C-alpha cells in the first residue's frame, strides 16, 4: 500500500501523447485552430503535446517521411491530398479524430443525402441531373417556365440548384414568375458579397447538379458545430440568398450569433457525428413548418469567434484523447483532469423592463400589425367575346372545359395570348383594307351601307385587339404579377335580332384581361420607409457596460434585437402582387436589407392564402353586392339630403360621412358634375397627347391611348342610360373614379397643368362621394357592419388570437424558433429579451372590416374616457388610405404574479392606429396651412359659413362656369410674409381669420410651432386632427422656388384659386356645434414672387450639394420666432382687412392672370406633398433633428386641447415630428424615428417621399389581455351568425316631393324577410 501511495504521487504516464495537425497551412494555423490547441495544452499540457505537419512535407514528401504522432487531426480542404493522409493512417495507425475514409462521402452531395436518408434525418426533397460523368448514364431534365421535371419528378419554382460536388459553391435559387422570376446566385464570399440577383430564370445546361425543393426559413441560416455526439454549438446568420450582403464584425469575420438548439436538433447532431464518423463536424440547418432540415454537411469546421466554444472544444477533445490512450495502454486516467462541459441552455433570468410609449414600465412581448398595401396603379380590365377557334384550342390546352374557365398568369401563357392578339391585329388590318376597297368600288346604296357598317365593326374590333396587344406588351417582359387573362366558356344561346327574329348563336369564350393594381415606385418607397420607421416601436439599445448611451434614433436597437435572434418575425401577405411586394419592401426597410425584392419576398413573406387567412367570405361578398345596389339607388335622388337621409345613410353619426353628405347636398347633381369632370379629363388627355411627341408615355410607361381608354371606360360605365332611356349613374364606380383621379394627380400632374381649378374640384367632389360609398359597402347599420366584418375577418382573428396565446405560453419546445443562446452570447446586455412579431399585409377590405370590429365590437366600456376619445378620433377619419396600420403591442410586467385589481394586469395591450398616407391632394395641404395661421392670440375660433359657396348648383352648370364666378373675389386674397410681419386680408369668401407675425408664422406653417389656443366654447374632448399635423410641405423643390427668402427679401404667400369647397378631413373643426360650421374651402398655397421665380441656384435646394440654403433660412427664422415668442404672445394680432400696395405687401388685381399663368407652369410640383426631413427640437443652443412614430395625443385628450397647445413652444424640445409622422408625442419615452441630416438625401429622392405617412395614434394603452382575448373569442364564435336581409331600395331615382315625404324610412324597409343559412353548423 505504501508503494502504491508513493507511486500515485509520481508521474504515472511514461510519456506525453503527441497530437499531429495534418492539414493545409491556412487551416492548421487559423485562429480557431490555434486557439483550441492552445487551450488543449493549457488544460492537458502535462499529458499531451502537439505539432503541425509542414505543408511542403504533406504535398511533396511520401507518407513514410511524414513525422510520427500518437493522435492525428486531419481533414480535407482544397488541394489537400486526402489519399496520402489515408495512406499515412494505414501505415502508422494513429488515433484519428475524424475518419478520413468517410470524408470522401462529404465531397459528393448525393452521398450526403443518402446517408441522411438512411439515418432518418430530415432533408429537402431532391433529384439529380448527371451529365458527362464516366460510368454514369446521363439523366433527363425537362424545363418549363415555372417548374422542371427531373427523372419524372416535378420541382416547382422556387427550387435550389447545387453542383454535385461539395467543393463547388456556386448555388442558384430560381424564383417563379409570380414573384418576378429570375434567380439568386450564391458563391463563396467575395469582400462583402455572398450572392447577387440575376433576371435569368433558365437552369444551367452543362454539368451535374442536384435539385432541391426550396425551404423558406425566414431569411436565416443555422450552422451547427458538433464536437462529439454530446455537444453541439449553433450559430445563426442572415441567409446569403436574402440580399447577398455579408455583415462583418470589426475583425472582418461574418457576424453570427449563438442560438438555442431544440432537443430534436441535438439528436440530429448526434446522428450526424456517428453516421459520418466525424468527431468535429459542421452542418447547416433550415427551420421551417415546424421541422428542422439538414441541407448540407460540411465536415471538419470550427466556430470563428467564440471563446467559450474554444474552451468547450479543447476540453472535449483533450478529454477524449487522454481517455482513449489511457484505455488502450492501460494507463490510469488522471483524477485531476478537466472534465468536458455540459452546456446549460436554461432561461432563468427575468427579461429587462422598458418604458412603454404611454409611460408604463413593462417588457414588450409581442407586436401584431395589420397593414394595407402601398400606393398602386388603378385596377383595369377589358372584356371580349371571342369565337376564334385558336382561342378554343388554347382553352382546351389548359383544361378549360373541366371548370368552364381558365386563368393565365404565367409568362408563357400570356405570351401565347399576345401572339394571338398580334395575329388578330394583322388580320383585322387586312380585313379593314379589303372593306375599304369594297367601299371605294361599291355602287349600290345598300352595298355601301353594309360596307360602312362592316368597317365600323372591324375598326372597333381592331382597336380592342390593339389595346390587348399594347397591354400585354407593356414593360417589355412578363413577370406574372401585374397582368392576368381569364377565359370563361359561354354556352350556345338564342338572341333576338333587330327585326325580332330569333337567332341561335354558337358557343363563345368571354376573354377578360386584367392589369394594373400594381405597386408604384412611390408605394414601394412608402413601404420601405414605414419598415424603417417601424423599428422604433421596439426597445432601444442598452450598453453592456452600464453607461448611458444616446437615444436610439434609427431603430438600431431593433436591428440588434433581430440580428441577435431575440426576435421571432413572421410576415404574411395575401396573394395579390401589390400586397406581397409591399410586404417585401417593408421587410427590406425593417431589416435594413439591400438588393432586389424578389429574394426577400420569397424568403421572408409567407402566403396567407394557403390556409384562407386573408380570403374573403363568399356570402359576405354577395351581401356587399346588395348593399352596393342599395347605395346605388339611395344616391340617385335629385334633391338635397334630408335629416332622414342622414339617419338612414349614416346611422352611427360618423363625422366624416356627415361632412361628406353636407358637402354633396344633392347627390344626383354631384354625380352630374363628376361625370362632366370625367368627360373633361377624356378631352384633356386627347389634347395633351396631340402636343406631345409620338410615343410619349405617362407614369409607368402607360401610353396615351391606354390612359384615354381608361377614362373613357370610367365615363361609359359611370354615366349610362337605363332601359327607359333615362340617364343614371353607377355609384359603385365612384371608388374607381377616385382611384383614377388620385393616381393621375399624384403621378401624372402634367395632364392637369392648365386645368388645375377644375381638377382640384373634381378630386374634392369624388373624394366626398367615396367617403360615403366606400365605408358603407361594408355595412350601414351596426349589426350589418359586425356580421360582414366577422365573416371576412374570422380566420385572421383566429390567427391573431393564436399569436397572443403562443407568445404568452412561451413554449421552449417550439422547434422552428431561432433564438439566442444567452449562456453563450457575448457583448449583449439583454440576452433574455425576446419579442414575437407577426405582420399581416392585406387589402382595403380587411382593414375596413377589422376597424368595424374594433369600433362596434364592445371592446371597451362606453364609459371609458380614453375609448371615447379614440372613437371620436376614428369618427373623423375619412378614408383608410394606402399603408393604413392597425397595431397591437403586448406588454408584460413580470413583477406581477397575475392580474390583480390593486396593481393592474400582468399583461396589457396597447392599440395603435394610423390611417396611412395623407390624402395626396393640394386641398388637404392647404387646410393644414390654414389652421396653422389661426394663432393663439385670436380671440375667436376660425369659422366658416355654410351658406357661402355651399348651395347646390344647377345640373346644367359646367365645372368651369361654377368656378369662374368665384374667381375674382378669391384672386384678391393674397397673404404676404415678410421677416417682420404677416399681412393677412379679411377673407369673406373663406371666412378665415388669419393673423400672425412673420417668424412665428414661418414656424407654424412648417409644423414647427403650434400656437392655437383653446377657447371657452370648445368641448374638453374636442379632437381636432389638424392640431396633430406637423408636416413640412415644400413647394417647387426642382430649383424653381423657395418658400422663404433670404433675410432681406420678401417671400409671398398666395391663396390659389380652387373654386371649390374643400373636403372634410378628420377633425376639421366640426365638433360641438359642428352642424353650424361649414366645410372650409381650399385655402392657402405657397407661391412666390417674380424675384424668387427667376432665382435658379443651389440655395433653393432643401438638401444635397448646396447644403440647403432654404433650410438654413427657414431654421434661422424659426429660431428668431422662438426667441421672440414671449413678446409675440402679448402683442395684439396684426390684421389688415384688404391688401394695400406697398413694398412688402399687396398684389394688384392686374397681376392675377400673370400669377395664375406662372403657377400653372409649376403646377405638377404643387400637387405633390414634398416632405423634407426637417425635424426640429432644441438641443442646447442649436437645432437638433429628431422624429417620432407614436402619438399619444388622442389617448391623453391632448388632441385638440388648445390650452395645452398654448405653451407648446416652451416644450419645443419635446419633439415635433415631420416626414411620415405627424403628431406631437406627449411621452418622453415615445420612440423616435430615424434622424436625417440635410445632406443625406438628394432633391430627387425627397420629391419621391410624398405623400407622407400619418403617425400611429395610440387609441388605448391599458386594455387587459384577458379582456382582449374575450373580445376575440366573442367575435370568432359569432362569425356563424346568419347574414340579415340587405336593405331594400329606399328611393327611386326621381320622385315628387309628395312621394318623397311618403317614402318609408330605411328602418321600415329593412325588415328581415329571411335568414341566409350559415355556411357551417355551430359548435
Curated annotation (Swiss-Prot):
Q: Compositional bias (Polar residues) at which positions?
A: 933-947, 977-992
Give the residues the record marks as binding ATP: 109, 162, 169, 188, 212-215, 221-223, 284, 296-298
Localization, per the record, is:
Cytoplasm, Cytosol
* Biased segments, Low complexity type: 993-1006, 1090-1101
Any idea which GO molecular function terms this record carries? 5-diphosphoinositol pentakisphosphate 1-kinase activity; ATP binding; inositol hexakisphosphate 1-kinase activity; inositol hexakisphosphate 5-kinase activity; inositol hexakisphosphate kinase activity; inositol-1,3,4,5,6-pentakisphosphate kinase activity
Top-rank EC class of the record's enzyme = transferase
Residue ranges, annotated region (Disordered): 933-1022, 1043-1107, 1134-1155
* InterPro entries noted in UniProt: Acid_Pase_AS, His_Pase_clade-2, His_Pase_VIP1, His_PPase_superfam, VIP1_N
Q: What does the record give as EC number?
A: 2.7.4.24
Q: Where is this region: Polyphosphoinositide-binding domain?
A: 355-426
Please tell me where substrate binds in this chain: 26-27, 188-189, 223, 237, 301-304
Q: Which domain of life is it from?
A: Eukaryota
Asked if the Swiss-Prot or TrEMBL record annotates the protein with the keyword Cell cycle, the reply is no
Q: Name one GO cellular component term.
A: cytoplasm
Q: Write out the domain note.
A: The N-terminal kinase domain produces inositol polyphosphates. The C-terminal acid phosphatase-like domain binds inositol polyphosphates and negatively regulates their accumulation. The C-terminal domain reduces the amount of inositol pyrophosphates in a dose-dependent manner in vitro.
Q: What does this protein do?
A: Bifunctional inositol kinase that acts in concert with the IP6K kinases to synthesize the diphosphate group-containing inositol pyrophosphates diphosphoinositol pentakisphosphate, PP-InsP5, and bis-diphosphoinositol tetrakisphosphate, (PP)2-InsP4. PP-InsP5 and (PP)2-InsP4, also respectively called InsP7 and InsP8, may regulate a variety of cellular processes, including apoptosis, vesicle trafficking, cytoskeletal dynamics, and exocytosis. Phosphorylates inositol hexakisphosphate (InsP6) at position 1 to produce PP-InsP5 which is in turn phosphorylated by IP6Ks to produce (PP)2-InsP4.
Spell out the protein name for this chain.
Inositol hexakisphosphate and diphosphoinositol-pentakisphosphate kinase
